[in-house]
Regions:
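Accessory DNA-binding and partner-docking regions appended to nucleic-acid-acting proteins
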Residues: 2-6, 362-666
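Helicase motor core with emphasis on the C-terminal RecA-like subdomain
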Residues: 2-13, 17-21, 25-37, 41-47, ...
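N-terminal functional modules and adjacent low-complexity/disordered segments of proteins
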Residues: 63-65, 289, 608, 640
Length: 666
């Protein structure tokens, strides 16, 4: 630990003369040993709130971050300032991971960054138990809360992990937390009200504009942006869209007008995305047209424009995305080209996540069957369970969390179902490195993991049975510990896959029908909340009161003060304050759905579904198909390749369901 004060560390290590608003309060509380939450506006310097204390705390600071991009940007910053920090992630080879673990165990490493999913890894948890940890940092902590806009069920387990690894305190970081989310976060980690530090969301350099979307939206964008893209003085710009195909179309239209724009979305391979991001960060490419896949962790100070070509997904998303503009403090513009035409697509995304009632029944039947076994253990391989129940991965995770909350199941542990190994020394030489009972144990391992060419698959049941016959402890835990030790020594390479979560069924005699109805009602309630979230966003953009003030009120920010020379409660630099409140144009009218050809559009899926499963699809599956919404069952059906897929993607999902009901009831 440094002998200097935090203020001196701020200057000597990070090169800053003064703390920014809220930072010193957070750092002081963390160094005093308090669990703390920092609710800072995007770009307000949340990361320093853990980076600086990490240098003063005696042991490791463990940072849980939702995205690899977030880790990489922060690691680059820390490396430039000489801070011993590293990550463990899925892109690394074994040697790199092993080196990071050794540095953490030795105390050399001050900061270790991981994804929340990494904590499900049995071997990684075993490693963490060998490391002393001073602080756990939860980045994007709003993911903890079901009231948040980006709820991630795995985050709910973080309080348990804090207890399991005996971590004395936590620091929660987020830019987008409403009062309900903050209360939820505080409760989960027992954070005192005085240890919640909020900086406020008002940024005086951001001009918030809302413009009604014109019929030719591309030309509207070109006319607005082109004067800012003169050669040699291009204004760095992010343009957000909803769909990948829109990103490609808009980027192409801008390029045709001489604006060097590139599309960025999840449909591009990772190398291409990294190259585009690098060009934007360096200033070689001034304009990015992106889905929300772009921007997390981006720390580019001179972004002059953030444009929402389509509606954002929520007020929280909007706040986070506009927060990427003007981090250098200079004037920047946030333009929303708003119309109701994109609302149906966003609403359909919400409906697409609601599981089938039959899928919930199937899920509960599996749990009930496991509850009837003597050990009441239920092993879950998420991909397989998603396929078997036809429930998407995220809603399925949420259902499992709900079942925990209902006291039906409880997570016990997770393990990699399959291990394989490759020797770097002769197996006989490996045995020869040990004596007595240990040598017999290693001989048992070698004899019971046959090698096919190069790799051998570990069969834990076979090893256990062989151990019982020879009166040798060959339990799964002991075998894994031994194999990891051999790998650490460089004697073999060990690989694991097929993460399996093990739950205990606490209440095996529940009523399947009653619980299924309750869970389905909860899913529908969540659906209504998300639809209301979209309506709240529309209300913001159509507001006749100051947009900046409305944003502050949404996040419970009582610190907003009107700038000098403006009316009370007005920012003076938004559309409303300029005297231009808007009424969002309605979506273009569509032909009556009653005139649509049911046979033409629905028959391809009906026929393939009947051939594959022996029965026609239900109305929910047909509606998903016609609206272009994916389901696990569509993968084996290759539904995306069928005529009719997404033919109604611009129509409201409930309308399509109602239209289908008229045919399916006949």
């Amino acid at each position: 630990m440094p002998s200097t004060s935090p203020q001196q560390t701020l200057k000597d290590v990070f090169g800053f003369d003064d703390f920014r608003g809220g930072q010193q309060a957070v750092v002081s509380r963390v160094l005093d040993g308090h669990s703390t939450a920092a609710i800072f506006a995007t770009g307000a310097g949340k990361s320093l709130c853990y980076q600086l204390p990490a240098l003063h705390l005696p042991h490791l600071t463990l940072v849980v971050s939702p995205l690899l991009a977030l880790m990489q940007d922060q690691l680059s910053f820390l490396a430039r300032h000489g801070v011993a920090a590293a990550s463990i992630d899925s892109t690394q080879d074994r040697e790199t991971t092993r080196d990071v673990m050794e540095r953490a165990k030795s105390g050399e490493l001050k900061i270790l960054m991981i994804s929340v999913e990494r904590l499900k890894n049995e071997r990684f948890r075993h490693f963490l138990r060998q490391v002393r940890i001073s602080l756990m940092v939860v980045d994007e902590a709003h993911c903890l809360s079901e009231w948040g806009h980006n709820f991630r069920p795995d985050y709910l387990k973080l309080p348990d992990y804090q207890h399991d690894f005996a971590i004395p305190q936590v620091l929660l970081l987020t830019a987008t937390a409403t009062p309900a989310v903050i209360a939820d976060m505080r409760e989960k980690f027992a954070i005192a009200p005085d240890n919640v530090i909020t900086t406020g969301f008002y940024r005086s350099n951001l001009e918030l504009l809302v413009a009604p979307a014109m019929e030719d939206r591309q030309q509207q964008l070109i006319d607005w942006l082109k004067p800012q893209m003169l050669p040699g003085s291009e204004a760095p710009t992010i343009i957000y869209v909803t769909l990948q195909q829109t990103a490609e179309q808009v980027a192409k239209a801008l390029a045709a007008q001489g604006i060097a724009a590139q599309a960025y979305h999840a449909g591009l391979d990772s190398e291409r995305r990294d190259a585009i991001q690098g060009q934007f960060m360096r200033g070689d490419s001034p304009c990015i047209v992106a889905t929300i896949a772009f921007g997390m962790g981006i720390d580019k100070g001179n972004i002059r424009n953030v444009v929402h070509y389509d509606l954002p997904k929520s007020i929280e998303n909007y706040s986070q995305e506009i927060g990427r503009a003007g981090r250098d403090g200079l004037p920047s513009t946030c333009l929303t080209m708003a119309g109701r035409d994109g609302l149906r697509v966003l609403e359909n995304f919400v409906y697409g996540d609601t599981p089938e009632y039959a899928g919930i029944i199937r899920l509960l039947e599996e749990i009930a069957a496991a509850g009837g076994q003597p050990d009441r253990q239920w092993e879950v391989l998420l991909f397989t369970l998603s396929r078997d129940t036809n429930i998407r991965s995220l809603p399925l995770k949420t259902l499992l969390v709900r079942l925990e909350m209902h006291g039906i199941i409880a997570p016990r542990f997770a393990f990699l179902a399959e291990y394989r190994l490759r020797y770097h020394i002769e197996p006989s030489e490996l045995v020869g490195r040990f004596e007595g009972e240990r040598a017999a144990f290693v001989r048992l391992i070698v004899d019971n993991i046959p090698i096919a060419r190069t790799w051998g698959t570990v069969d834990f049941d076979r090893l256990h049975n062989a151990g019982q016959a020879q009166h040798i402890d060959a339990s799964r835990a002991r075998v894994i510990t031994a194999l990891e030790y051999f790998q650490d020594k460089g004697w073999l390479t060990l690989e694991g896959k097929r993460m399996t979560d093990v739950y205990e069924v606490l209440q095996p005699n529940f009523s399947i029908e009653a619980l299924a109805s309750q869970l389905f009602d909860e899913c529908r309630h969540r659906e209504r909340i998300e639809i209301e979230r979209l309506q709240a966003m529309l209300a913001l953009f159509e507001s006749e009161s100051c947009l900046t003030r409305r944003l502050a009120e949404h996040f419970g920010d009582s610190t907003f003060d009107a700038p000098p020379d403006t009316e009370q409660g007005r920012c003076g630099h938004c559309s409303v304050c300029y005297g231009h409140p808007v009424r969002l144009p309605d979506a273009p009218p569509l032909a009556a759905l009653s005139d649509a050809d049911f046979v033409r559009y629905a028959t391809p899926l009906i026929e393939r579904h009947a051939h594959q499963f022996g029965q026609p699809p239900n109305a929910q599956r047909l509606a998903h198909f016609l609206c272009g919404l994916t389901m696990p069952v569509f993968t084996p059906l290759k539904a995306r390749s069928l005529d009719g897929f997404a033919v109604f993607e611009q129509r409201a999902y409930p309308e399509v369901r109602e239209w289908l009901a008229g045919y399916l009831e006949c």
